[in-house]
């Protein structure tokens, strides 16, 4: 059995690392919670009023709700792993955090991939029969595809609770110049099982997202070049919108890929538990959902207007409190 073992003692992490990780990842998580919570509140309120949400808004609601859950869970894991290590390194608690983290991340990756596929089919133009067929069927199929994504995420996440992660504790490590001992935690990861379940759960949405994002960028780029050849000028609002969409899609693609890599490295325990590389993975994993939630609000006219109204109401409330 191919395994990776890492170890950590109670005293091998400095206060600076604890503070830095909690502050940076905390800011990212809080930003993401506010962004995802805002999107969930907007679309959730419409759904609660009995309105039928368009397909794109339905995907956004599921994506933002799953991200809200993910960011709250990531914040909890960071707090427990850094401040309550005795509890966190109990085998059952450790496995619970890892399994739910993988499930929420897989769900997010699937929903983000479907959102990009949906926008690609709605916006891009390619003269291919398969593309036209998908364009016609996507609205009917999307609710079933979203449900299937949740089931797939479950089926490839919960098997990780068996024969993948194990934590051992050795309480008899002597401390130099002292008669006491300290606890040493050994984390063992079955890499064969992890690679299989992780890759099976992430491979399809990753390929879907990269393909949809690439096709969308190519289509927008082709249309932008066509507009430029017609001398519409770079100041034309349509061209600016296309260039902005290309930049936003490229930015999201980079975030998506980096998050997938960081998640795998974090789950595999390749790096020491409290090493700088492992902390970097935590920061990247927190930055992806936060960054994309902000991008979704800024890039969606309806959400942008709702956010400005929300800001205005908050300012009025604060002014009323100070009077």
Curated annotation (Swiss-Prot):
What name is this protein filed under?
Answer: Taste receptor type 2 member 40
Originating species? Pan paniscus (Pygmy chimpanzee)
Show the GO MF annotations: bitter taste receptor activity; G protein-coupled receptor activity
Per its database record, what is this protein's job? Answer: Gustducin-coupled receptor implicated in the perception of bitter compounds in the oral cavity and the gastrointestinal tract. Signals through PLCB2 and the calcium-regulated cation channel TRPM5.
Taken from the record's topology, the Cytoplasmic segments are 36-58, 122-140, 212-247, 298-323
Q: Which PANTHER family match?
A: TASTE RECEPTOR TYPE 2, TASTE RECEPTOR TYPE 2 MEMBER 40
UniProt topological domain (Extracellular) ranges: 1-14, 80-100, 163-190, 269-276
Which family, according to the similarity comment? Belongs to the G-protein coupled receptor T2R family.
